[in-house]
Swiss-Prot record:
Species for this entry: Escherichia coli
UniProt keyword Repeat present: no
GO biological process per UniProt: quorum sensing
Keywords on record: Conjugation, Plasmid
One Pfam family named in its UniProt record: Activator-TraM
TM annotation in the entry: none
Recorded family membership: To plasmid R751 TraM.
InterPro entries, alphabetized: TraM (IPR028140)
The protein's name in its UniProt record: Protein TraM
Domain of life: Bacteria
């Protein structure tokens, strides 16, 4: 501090041409002013540190809030996706079951129709053969009379 005072005394003498002593009231004001400036700077540093801490707290809360909101949105999207996937799977299973049922019904219907046609043809042949046997028997009875 005394170096600053000596430097100030030299500066006042050089600029203004006035000799100032160490006990001059101007230097007392300078000392008081320097002390007030130092105290003010310390208090501003303290306020700045508190403000910085408050900003960090706010940023942390915002980060946590954003994380919580993102997690809620992700969970909602996941639930919606699961529901949509379950619905699509259910619809697809129903469509596949219906397609299989139609194929089985169509396949059985064709096979059954073919079997019925074969049975009808065999029945017609049996009726023709029976008619021929009846006609032959009638001829034998008529010839024997």
């Amino acid at each position: 501090m005394s170096d600053q005072i000596e430097e100030l005394i030299r500066e006042i003498a050089a600029k203004h041409g006035i000799a100032v002593g160490r006990d001059d009231p101007v230097l007392i004001l300078h000392t008081i002013n320097a002390r007030l400036m130092a105290d003010s700077a310390a208090k501003q540093e303290e306020i700045l540190a508190a403000f910085k801490e408050e900003l960090e707290g706010i940023a942390h809360r915002w980060g946590e809030d954003a994380k919580a909101k993102a997690e809620r949105m992700l969970n909602a999207a996941l639930a919606a996706s699961k529901d949509a996937m379950a619905k699509v799977m259910k619809d697809s299973a129903a469509q596949a079951a219906e397609a299989i049922r139609r194929e089985i019904d169509d396949g059985l219907g064709r096979q059954l129709a073919a079997k019925v046609a074969d049975a009808r043809r065999v029945a017609m042949m049996n009726m023709i053969a029976g008619g021929m046997v009846l006609f032959a028997a009638a001829l034998v009875v008529w010839a024997s009379l």
